[in-house]
Amino acid sequence: MKMPILPPLPLASRHLLLASAIALAAGCAGLPDQRLAQEALERGDLATAQSNYQALAAMGYADAQVGLADMQVASGDSAQQAKAEKLYREAAQTSPRARARLGKWLAAKPGASDAEHREAERLLSQAFEQGEDSALVPLIVLYLQYPQSWPEIDPQQRIDQWRARGLPQADLAQIILYRTQGTYAQHLGEIEQVCQRWLRRMDVCWYELATVYQMQGNAEKQKVLLEQLRAAYKAGRVPGERVDSVAGVLADGELGQPDPQTAQALLEEIAPSYPAAWVSLAKLLYDYPDQGDLEKMLGYLKNAQDAAQPRAELLLGRLYYDGKWAPQDPRKAERHLLKAAASEPQANYYLGQIYRRGFLGKVYPQKAVDHLILAARAGQASADMALAQLWSQGRGIQPNRVNAYVFGQLAVQQQVPQASDLLGQIEAQLPPAERSQAQQLLKREQQSRGNNWQATVSLLQSQDSPINEEEPESL
């Protein structure tokens, strides 16, 4: 069985004059507005954001083209992402910001070629030289993921040079390097100092400081930080997305003593104006049943569904998949998960398991492979384990020791429980000729994902922090 494989700018000045004339004549009533689009996006109103961005993008506004393309990339739909790349390319002819976004997309694009990675490096370097500091972090991530393409580049040396110039994004790149190297915990003091300095310029520092204090168990500093975060959010200086991410830190038991009560209070404050928080609230109840009951969870999810939040469909699918809160119903689970799959990699993992395990009455091996491959390449380590099991066990499918070995190795590298035992069984049955073939396929799969892909798969999204033009200020 073959391994499945994933599948001229208008004159801006002319449109500016036209739009200005219309605005003067009509008093701006009903006209598309980029500020409204951004505000709608921040509160999770995707329909309003998209309609405003689309109208402005059609008139050739580069910033609106970038905003619309960002939404299309975030959708997870391959057809929408192809449209996004086209928009980025149009805007990149005049906008350094668009060049940075195009480079960032090509760096993170699933199945991107070496030529696309090199184009990404060129675009990001060019945008950075033109004063677009947001290009710095994705450029470092690109070097970290594909070191074989730039053997002459030492990421740490580059970061040191940029930090010597006082660039805030260089400090952020250093934090990312610590994360990918697994040395974050050894640098908590430095990270705290850096993020106190740049807190008012990089909103991601709220997340980093909350993480530091959670890992240190410093309840007093955490309390002060949360008070400041609430004030900054109410003043419009911090988006709801960042408050949501801080609540996630508070609820994460792997970082230290979790505080689900405070996390819930934070999320309930922002949910009415930031609908994605309804899903985070439901997930909090899922993980901490003492915080509420099924009726409350479903109420949260209903609010999220009403706001067209795909993560709500993911969590509903999971509810009916595992039967933890509601009776198991694989068909309901499948229906919800299919709605979420375009933008939520976890949904593909659960769909793959439904098809692999025969939860719908029989095994659907090709459907299982298709969804598990998507999940695995999006950073879901458990999907690699499931693929290794599928091809080694041969349930409803011809066993394939080579494929089983490839995904078993990937699962072991990500420290998936029981993966070593499974890989040992696979290796014992693998003749030398097949082992050589498997090693080649493994190398190809690793290169397609990039080095450190699991650690960096979401960095280009979660660390895209805006820079506010203010002087650095300590807490």
UniProtKB/Swiss-Prot annotation:
Tagged with keyword DNA damage: no
Compositional bias annotation for Polar residues: 448-466
SMART domains: SEL1
GO BP annotation list: alginic acid biosynthetic process
Lineage top rank: taxon: Bacteria
Pathway named in the protein's UniProt entry: Glycan biosynthesis; alginate biosynthesis
Membrane topology reported for the UniProt record: Lipid-anchor
Lipidation (S-diacylglycerol cysteine): 28
Keywords: Alginate biosynthesis, Cell outer membrane, Lipoprotein, Membrane, Palmitate, Signal
Region ranges (Disordered): 436-475
Gene disruption phenotype: Cells lacking this gene in the mucoid strain FRD1 are phenotypically non-mucoid, i.e. non-alginate producing, and secrete high levels of dialyzable and low-molecular-weight uronic acids.
Pfam families: Sel1
Annotated lipid attachment (N-palmitoyl cysteine): 28
GO cellular component, one term: cell outer membrane
UniProt subcellular location: Cell outer membrane
Secretion signal, residue range per the UniProt entry: 1-27
Membership in a protein family: Belongs to the AlgK family.
Job description of the protein: May be involved in the polymerization of mannuronate to alginate.
Known partners and oligomeric status: Interacts with AlgX.
Protein name, per record: Alginate biosynthesis protein AlgK
Organism: Pseudomonas aeruginosa (strain ATCC 15692 / DSM 22644 / CIP 104116 / JCM 14847 / LMG 12228 / 1C / PRS 101 / PAO1)
